[in-house]
Structure formats: structure tokens, C-alpha cells
Amino acid sequence: MQFAQKLDQLEKRFDELTQQMADPAVISDADQYRKVAKAQSELSDIAAKYREWKKVEDGLAQARPMLQEQDAELKEMAELEIAQLEPEKLRIEEELRVLLLPKDPNDDKNVVLEIRAGTGGDEATLFAAEIFRMYSRYAETQNWKMEVTSSSESSVGGLKEVIALVSGNKVYAKLKYESGVHRVQRVPVTEQQGRVHTSAITVAVLPEADEVEVKLEAKDIRIDTFCSSGPGGQSVNTTYSAVRITHLPTGLVVSCQDEKSQIKNRAKAERVLRSRLYELELEKQQAALGAERRTMVGSGDRSEKIRTYNFPQNRVSDHRIGLTLHQLDFVMEGKMDAIVDALTEFYQAQKLKQQAEKGPVS
């Protein structure tokens, strides 16, 4: 295997980190222990998979000499074992190639999820609410926490806009390919002629930035407070608990009124603002990359039409990878694994292809 030397080094590093986690000096230092545990965790899958490969390789090394045996029964046993182990070895090597791909540094981050109704009027707001419900259900299946920071309802009970913080394990890794335009094709409840209409919403998934990555300077922000309001604009309380933060250098504005506490609303608004500023920096970096590299990592362009939900045909189609599922009812209930897994595998294959063109992993 071309990259066995690389894997030997990573396995050795994994063992070193495992030993450090048992070191009393490391255990007594919470920050240091957290860093070591994180580094060890990042290598655990690779180390386990490499050991699995070595076990298979040992089995093959023992079976191959038996092909020279005069005993027909022993020879047949060796042939059967090799026939079983060779495909297993190839499968593990493919999995190792995926594990060795450069990691997206944002994959472990929480996200800011933004959904906005686009073309289609009231129907678009109803669809925005349904898509938000879809993601909420999916978050439940993943044991993620979803917190709404702000939302704007339409007169028909839909959502003009909703912004939420999603926290948990590998949130960005699983939701990062959701950014873009989502179209719905169906007969609206207000349609008298039974004609199918097309409406659209936009989804943005931003990796959440922490205070170290994006520092908010007091001189750069203006904070306004106001009374929270419900649907139709009516006041829902008499205290100035809602918060609006304006980032003066960029003009970005973030509001939060979901909590009754002004302090909690401000904290949530700051999390969203940091993530938007982080996204601006990521966009600058993306612009500096070549077009081919941007394709490999997935553009995340909000104007890109990525998916169509056709209700009459119970069909959902992802246009980027040519995926069509006639299980729209399941998907809308938050059963998104088939789509998420297919997108992940597609972009992993793209990266593997790019890696192969560069040459073997050193």
C-alpha cells in the first residue's frame, strides 16, 4: 500500500496521544487534556482502520504460502481465504484513502441555519416553514440542539425568514451541502384550477465561529434594544429584551428576540454575527482558490439551484449529483440520511479523484 508509511506515523502518534491522556500532568490541566483528547479522537478512526488492514494483510501473508502445499485440501482452504480477504483488503484501503483526505476544518463546528422565502409569495413562506420543520426533525434524529434566534411569520402561517443555531456532533459536516436554492413544485392551497406552481426558498448554512476566531471589538458594534414583537407586529412584552447588533465596518445587522432575557438575546445575536463575519472571510479565501478547487469543496453558493421537491410525484431531486428519490414524504419528516450520505460520498469521490491526479499520499 502506497501510504503505509504515512499510516505507520499516524498510528504511532495515536499511541503517543493515548499515553498522554493517562499522564497525571495532562489530566490535571483541563485545557491540555482537552487538546490531547481532541487530537487523539481525530486519529482514532484512522488507527482502528489501519489495524484492521494489518490484520487482513497478516491473514493473506499466512495464506499465500499455503498455495504451494501438496495437500489439495490445505491448498483449497488457502484459496478460499485469499478469495475472501483480497476484496476485504481493497475495501479497507478505499476507506483509508477517504480517512486520509484533508479534513474540512469546519466539519466539527456548530452552524447558523438561515432560511428565507423567495419567489412564490405565500406559498414560498409555507414551504420555508416546512423545510425548517424538516431540518428540525433531522436535528432530533442526530441529537442536535436547535435554537431559533429570530423568525418572521407570514400572514398565512408560513415563515418569511427564520434563523437558528444548531449545536451538536458534526453539524456542519452533515449540513454544509444544504446551502442554495430549494424549489418546490405543487398545487398551492389557494390554487382553484389545480395547476402546479413552482416556488423557491434559499438556505444558508454558516459554520459558527468562536470568540477566538472572530473577536467583536466594542468600537465596531452598535447595540440597540427594543420590545419583542409577535406575528402582526404586536408587542409580546413591555421590556426591552430584544437586541439588534450592527457591525459598523461591514454594515451587517443581526437581531434576536427569541429569549425573554436581553442578555441571552445579545449572546445569541453575537454568535450569529460572528458566524456571518467568519463567512465573509471564508468567501475571500474561496475567491482566491482556483475554480477546480472550489468545485471539489462544493461552492455553497446560495444562488445555486440545488434541489427540487415535487409533491405530486413524491419526488426529491438533487441536481448537483443527479440523485432522485421517490420518497419525498419521508424526507420531509426529517429522514435525510440518504441525501446527506449521497452528497458526502460524491464530494469525497471528487476529492479522491483530485488527490489521485496529484499523486500518492506522502
Curated annotation (Swiss-Prot):
Pfam families: PCRF, RF-1. The modification N5-methylglutamine is found at residue 234. InterPro entries: PCRF, Pep_chain_release_fac_I, Pep_chain_release_fac_I_sf, Prokaryotic/Mito_RF, RF-1. Methylated by PrmC. Methylation increases the termination efficiency of RF1. GO terms for cellular component: cytoplasm. Keywords: Cytoplasm, Methylation, Protein biosynthesis. SMART domains: PCRF. Its main location: cytoplasm. The keyword Protein biosynthesis applies. GO terms for molecular function: translation release factor activity, codon specific. SUPFAM superfamilies: Release factor. It is found in: Cytoplasm. Belongs to the prokaryotic/mitochondrial release factor family. HAMAP family: Rel_fac_1 (MF_00093). NCBIfam families: prfA, PRK00591.1. Peptide chain release factor 1 directs the termination of translation in response to the peptide chain termination codons UAG and UAA. PANTHER family: LD18447P (PTHR43804:SF7). This is Peptide chain release factor 1.
